[in-house]
Regions:
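Extended, charge-enriched "interface" segments that sit outside catalytic cores
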Residues: 2-101
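Glycine-rich, histidine-containing beta strand-loop boundary motifs that form or position
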Residues: 114, 150-154, 224
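A conserved hydrophobic secondary-structure block that centers on an alpha-helix together
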Residues: 120, 124-147, 151
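Hydrophobic or amphipathic alpha-helical targeting/insertion segments
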Residues: 142-160, 164, 171-174
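Extended, Lys/Arg-enriched charged tracts that mediate electrostatic binding to polyanionic substrates
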Residues: 167-211
């Protein structure tokens, strides 16, 4: 007897990203949320907080997650709030004047490589003092308008949150990051597909997706190696 194996029940996995619809009148908020410039500019963080203070706290002060969480009705109501709209336009004008300034071409260009960057608690790609220092370097380079780019890694499980056990011992809680709700954007190739870079290592290649973090004027490229094609040892 010959038995044929059917693939009818084999799942066909596809990645789908669902985003909330931001009214055209509030698109400036979305653009600013995707640049970590807000992390060291209090006018911007205060603006996002005042959109909905309760939700702002619930999403951990993450502007991207905040805009995704707000209901359509809430967003429509904000378009009619003249105070919020004026504040948004004022902050956006400062933001655009800042990011559109051209770097001094007389100074050397800099490529900065680091394993971790402490830019904001929202983006957990750091673990200690080295990362915080590297993050400050990028922010200062942005404020000084240095022609710099950063290179690093994107981690699914970044820095942990701490809690205490009943006997007073520290517990490290590692939470998986939802990349779709972070101030990062995936880099696409010329065919509109996620860019993959191949890095030779020992006797095989490590494949990595590339994501971009806008740190004010400084672009930070981070690679992510957690691909299905890899053995577990190649995952970050």
């Amino acid at each position: 007897m010959k038995i044929k194996v059917s693939n009818a029940n084999t799942p066909n996995w596809k990645e789908v990203t669902v985003k909330s619809h931001i009214p055209e009148e509030l698109k400036k908020l979305e653009e600013m949320a995707r640049n970590i410039w807000w992390a060291w500019n209090y006018e911007a963080t205060d603006l996002f907080r005042d959109l909905d203070p309760v939700t702002w706290k619930e999403v951990g002060q993450n502007p991207v997650a905040l805009l995704e969480r707000l209901s359509y009705e809430k967003l429509e109501a904000l378009t009619q709030d003249k105070v919020i709209v004026k504040r948004m336009n004022d902050v956006y004008a400062k933001f655009k004047a800042y990011v559109d300034a051209k770097p001094d071409s007389k100074r050397p260009s800099v490529a900065y490589f680091c394993m971790e960057y402490g830019l904001t608690h929202v983006l957990k790609i750091y673990s200690g003092g080295l990362g915080i220092l590297a993050g400050d370097y990028l922010k200062e380079a942005s404020d000084s308008n240095v022609d710099m780019c950063g290179v690093g890694f994107l981690y699914r499980y970044g820095y942990f949150s701490q809690s205490l056990s009943m006997d007073g011992q520290q517990i490290a809680n590692y939470e998986s990051q939802n990349f779709g709700s972070l101030p990062i954007e995936r880099v696409m190739d010329e065919n509109g597909q996620p860019m993959v870079v191949d890095v030779p290592y020992l006797n095989y290649f490590v494949h990595a997706y590339v994501w971009k973090v806008n740190v004010g004027r400084v672009p930070l490229s981070v690679s992510y190696t957690h691909l299905r094609a890899h053995e577990t040892s190649a995952h970050l």
